[in-house]
């Protein structure tokens, strides 16, 4: 599903992740106040920077 937002177009998707990864995302979400999507986007940017 594609959703248009003020600053960008967002694509929604369902993914399967391990329970450990999910719990880590939940902890980081609570600690930082960011959404899971924001955390995943930051992780992707870090991985791209390593290339």
UniProtKB/Swiss-Prot annotation:
<protein>
    <recommendedName>
        <fullName>Uncharacterized protein E-51</fullName>
    </recommendedName>
</protein>
<comment type="function">
    <text>This protein is non-essential for virus function.</text>
</comment>
<dbReference type="Pfam" id="PF01402">
    <property type="entry name" value="RHH_1"/>
</dbReference>
<dbReference type="InterPro" id="IPR002145">
    <property type="entry name" value="CopG"/>
</dbReference>
<dbReference type="GO" id="GO:0006355">
    <property type="term" value="P:regulation of DNA-templated transcription"/>
</dbReference>
């Amino acid at each position: 599903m594609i959703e248009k937002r003020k600053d960008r177009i967002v694509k929604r998707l369902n993914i399967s992740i391990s329970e450990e990864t999910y719990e880590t995302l939940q902890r980081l979400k609570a600690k930082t106040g960011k959404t899971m999507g924001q955390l995943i986007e930051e992780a992707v940017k870090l991985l791209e920077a390593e290339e």
